[in-house]
C-alpha cells in the first residue's frame, strides 16, 4: 500500500499549484492514516495480556503433501539410519593442530589436588595487569569485576619454585556438556551449593566449541580467537582458593563449567575447513579434552527430544517456516563420539524427567559420580529442595501446544536414535515411552 502511494506521488504531474498542494495533502493524509493504523495494531498486540498468537502469521499455502505422505518420508529416513565408528586421531595429529595448547597444559597435574592444576612459570613484567586484555572480561561485565579483584591480589599469590615465579593454573575437574534446554542450569545451580564445588561465572563460556575458534555467538562467522590463557583465567578464583588450601598439603575442592554446546557443537570446522576435511572433522572437542585431561568426568542431562524441540519455542502453531535444530536431539550420535575416547564410567547421563521428579536422588547420583564428600542432612535438603532454575517462562507456554502431526513426525524421526541410545546406556527409559528405571 505504501509503495502505491509513493509511486502515485512520484508520477503525479499537475501544472496547477492548487492541484499539486491538494494531491500532496491527500498523499500525506493517506500515509499518516496507514502509519496510525499500523501503530494501533502493534500497540493493541503489545498491550494484550495474552499474546497467544503471532502478530503476523505467515501465509500457509495449501498443503501439497498429505499427512500420510509426510509419515512415509520420515519412516524412510529412519530406515537409512546407520551408526558407524569414527576414526580417532592420535595425539601427534592433535599436537599438530593445537601446538600452543599442548605447550601450556602439562602432561601431569599436581598429585595432592583432586582438581587438575599445575604451576605455570611467569615471564615478563609481573606488575602488569594479567587480565587487562582478557576477551571474556571485555565481553562480560561480571567477569571484568572479578578480574579487577584478582588483579589486586595477583602478585601476592605468586610463588617461587626452583628460583622462578609461578602461578597456579587449573582446568575443570568435570564438565556439564549438554544438552540445551535439558536442565543444565538447574544442575549447575544445585552443584554450586556443595561445599567442595567451586564455580565461577560464566556458566557457559563455550570456549571449546566456539570461542577458541573466534565464534562469539552461535551461527556467527569467526572473529578474534579467545586464547587458552583467557579460558584458564576464568578458573583463577578457584585456583586461588585451592592454593590457599595447599597450606594443608591437599585440597578436595573442584571446579567445573556447563557449556551446553560442548557435547554436540562441532560446527566451527565448517568455517575453518569447509568441505576440505572429508566426511567428518579431523578432530572433535572430546579428542582434545581427552589428550589433555584423560581422567576428566562429564555429565549430560537429556530430555525427550520431542519435548526439547517444543521448549525451544520454534515449533509453534501456525508457523512452519522457522529453522529448527533437530540435530541437537540426536543424543546417541554425540554420545558415541564421546565414548570413542572416554570410558563409560567417565560419563554420567541423566534424564531431565527423572531429575525433575526426584532431584534428591538425581543429585545423590551426581555426588557419587564426582566422588564428593558426604553432606549434612541440612545441606542435602537445601540442595534437593531448591526451586528449579531456568524453567519455561509463562509467556512461552501461551504459544500453545505443538501441532499433533508435528509431534507425531518428530516422534517417528527420533525413534531409531532413542532406541539406539537406550541400547548404549542399557536403560529403556531413554526411549521416552513412559518407562524408567530411576523414578
Predicted regions and their residues:
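PAPS-dependent sulfotransferase catalytic domain
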Residues: 30-33, 38, 52, 196-197, ...
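PAPS-dependent sulfotransferase catalytic core
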Residues: 2-273, 292, 296, 308, ...
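Short, surface-exposed alpha-helical recognition segments that flank or form part
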Residues: 219-222, 226, 277, 322-326, ...
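Generic structural signal for well-ordered alpha-helices
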Residues: 228-236, 286, 335-336, 418
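Short glycine/proline-rich turn/loop motifs
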Residues: 159-160, 164-169, 264, 313-321, ...
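The conserved 3'-phosphoadenosine-5'-phosphosulfate
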Residues: 2, 11-22, 41-80, 316, ...
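Amphipathic alpha-helical recognition patches that constitute DNA-binding helices
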Residues: 175, 186, 288, 297, ...
